[in-house]
């Protein structure tokens, strides 16, 4: 089994990279998204939940994430939490059953900020992209998926996304074994990474 960490800023193309690697390694990959492991905030009033900074490492339940990655490594099945951005809370009744696989991809903007999690990874990949390109993708995503206007999306980027990127995400790039420039558009890099993973599996 290989544990692959894929990090990078919001809108960098991580999802595209993960999808392409998963496609090339058909049937061998399970993806564990960081976004499923935000801390449960159901005990907070709704107005307090809206103030949560999802781009800060403190928002992530790294203890549970590390525990479940360790369980997958041991060949155990896990019950992955289900988190709702709408209610800012973890489902009390629903989980996703995840079986072990040859390749476990742990994906998210903050996955390199936790040493305990990094230490479980065999390969660490950072997806890099131009700030302007990331901003455009973030605005489109926030409007289409999170109900924001252009103005509120830009405000969110300026007040939260960019400062957290500079403070936590960009510095975590130094932990990467591989940096993919041009984000999800870099087909050559993605092909090389998929081939490298295949070789590593073969050599285990």
Where are these regions (language model features)?
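Short hydrophobic/aromatic beta-strand immediately N-terminal to the Walker A/P-loop
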Residues: 4-5
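Hydrophobic positions on the alpha1 helix immediately C-terminal to the Walker A/P-loop
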Residues: 17
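Post-Walker A helix-loop "phosphate-sensing" segment adjacent to the P-loop in P-loop NTPases
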Residues: 23-32
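Conserved nucleotide-sensing/catalytic segment adjacent to the nucleotide-binding pocket
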Residues: 30-31, 39, 43-87
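NTP-dependent small-molecule kinase module
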Residues: 99-100, 140, 162-204
């Amino acid at each position: 089994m290989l544990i692959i960490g894929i990090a990078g800023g919001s809108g960098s193309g991580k999802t595209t990279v993960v999808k392409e690697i998963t496609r090339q390694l058909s049937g061998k990959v399970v993806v564990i998204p960081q976004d499923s492991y935000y801390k449960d905030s159901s005990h907070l009033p709704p107005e307090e939940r809206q103030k949560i900074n999802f781009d800060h490492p403190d928002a992530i339940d790294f203890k549970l994430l590390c525990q479940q990655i360790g369980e997958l490594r041991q060949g155990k099945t896990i019950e992955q939490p289900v988190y709702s951005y709408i209610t800012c809370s973890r489902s009390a009744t629903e989980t996703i059953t995840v079986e072990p696989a040859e390749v476990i991809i742990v994906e998210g903007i903050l996955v390199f900020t936790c040493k305990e999690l990094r230490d479980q990874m065999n390969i660490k990949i950072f997806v890099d992209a131009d700030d302007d390109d990331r901003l455009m993708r973030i605005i489109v995503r926030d409007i289409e998926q999170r109900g924001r206007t252009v103005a509120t999306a830009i405000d969110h980027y300026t007040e939260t996304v960019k400062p957290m990127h500079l403070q936590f995400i960009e510095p975590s790039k130094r932990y990467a074994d591989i940096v993919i420039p041009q984000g999800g558009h870099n087909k050559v890099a993605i092909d090389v990474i998929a081939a490298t993973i295949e070789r590593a599996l073969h050599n285990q």
